[in-house]
Amino acid sequence: MVRSGKNGDLHLKQIAYYKRTGEYHPTTLSSERSGIRRAAKKFVFKEKKLFYVGKDRKQNRLVVVSEEEKKKVLRECHENGPGVHHGISRTLTLVESSYYWTSVTNDVKQWVYACQHCQVAKSTVIVAPQQHLSVVGNPWSVVTVDLMGPFHTSSRSHVYAMIMTDLFTKWVMILPLCDVSASEISKAIINIFFLYGPPQKIIMDQRDEFIDQINVELYRLFGAKEIVISQASGSVNPSESTPSTVKTFLSKHCAEHPETWDEELPALSFAFNVTRVEPTKNSPYFQMFNRNPCLLECPHEGGGEGTSVFARIVAAVREADGVVENQTPAAGQMESSTSEELSKSKVAKKKPKQLNPFHLKVGHEVLRQRKNWWKDGRFQSEWVGPCVIDYITDSGCAVLRDNTGTRLKRPIKMSHLRPYVREPSEQDSLYLLQGSIVADHDYIGLPEIPVGTYQANILVEDATIGIVDNELLISSKDHELLEYRNSKISALVEDHSSLEKQTFSLLDSSNQVLEYLS
């Protein structure tokens, strides 16, 4: 490591001198010698040239000292052919893969920042044109044209299909095409002009050169100037173009009827136009002519043999449109479901509060958490005690007494407590807590009870010691505590009669302790 203010080239010269002669360079300070020795382990001489191999000794980077060599390396790694320059990250990667000097990172940054070619290229920013979506307010004012295919060649030599969709009414016209040349598409568009008149704009998702050819043909055949524009101009929202139901059903129909798919395109168009659409709840036919068509035959869903071809087509179109509606929820449903999922995820991520994870009760011996500090990537806790739970407040906090019987000033949260389990090596003790006797948890007379037994059982068995002499419990509070413990003992004795002998053996030892204390 190079000390602050020291020349990096001088540092490398000192390392090279030490590796070559085994002695320190005359300019090396006494405080720098240990650093030179450590750094020299990462360098080796190969063919009278110094190479940096690193700690793992797997690298092989030539040490560059002179300024001329540095500029040559930077020029070779930054310029990649005529007119192509790398950025800072790529240039630094190329330099560090083969060369080494102490200030390589800063030198690469300064070299790229000072490059005139990079500055000119960076200042030339192509700003995307601002999109101005046209507002469609009248029928047949803005029309989109989509091309589909190639399909199976029909009996009339048609291979492609052209779909014209009115953005305001969703009126659909499907026409067959033999090819997708500009002249063929222009002829099909003019046939629609003769039926409904020319719209204000026709939007196509094609390249500009192809659109210019179509405009030339339309002007030659119909006299319309620049009526077709590109969808890339941003004049229409792509989601408002041809409905996906039309494209999906047309692809399916052409696959099922490879020879005659072009003969039924007018029927398909009319079937889609008399089918109600979701946003307005009206059919495109009604939006276009402000009236509903007079259908001579009501199409049946079953599509039996008695129905016409057009009726079967209308039934299939309505069925396909219903499937798409069922699969695609409404915008309000999507927003509500999204909000519900977000709320559920937030609730799931929220960690539940552990109010009393150890099920602690009055009389339990516990350790309390006093201090937290950060260590080894997590918080460490300091536990002090033991203390005894005197009572539990309405808010769920515990009031504790220490081993001298002194009540602590502040209540402690139950989540900041944990049970205190005595070690088997500790002596059997009995301490007095301001008028109430609390026995120790270490049972000499009960060898079959393992250490760490559930605290409720330990407290019940400890409570039997309090029955030895009721006269010792003078205060009313102690009397209530004794009755509570006796009730617990009676239930235990009825269910576990086998513990009676152990309990009385413990009573004898406790009597001796009480007589000694008295």
From Swiss-Prot:
Gene Ontology molecular function terms on file: nucleic acid binding
Chain positions with Phosphoserine modification: 498
Region described as Disordered: spans on this chain: 326-348
PROSITE patterns (alphabetical): INTEGRASE
Keyword annotations of the record: Phosphoprotein
Domain of life: Eukaryota
Record GO biological process: DNA integration
Classification via SUPFAM superfamilies: Ribonuclease H-like
Name of one Pfam family that matches: Integrase_H2C2
Annotated ranges, domain Integrase catalytic: 135-293
PANTHER family assigned to the protein according to its UniProt record, in alphabetical order: PROTEIN CBG26694, PROTEIN NYNRIN-LIKE
Name of the protein in question: Gypsy retrotransposon integrase-like protein 1
Organism: Rattus norvegicus (Rat)
Gene name for this UniProt entry: GIN1
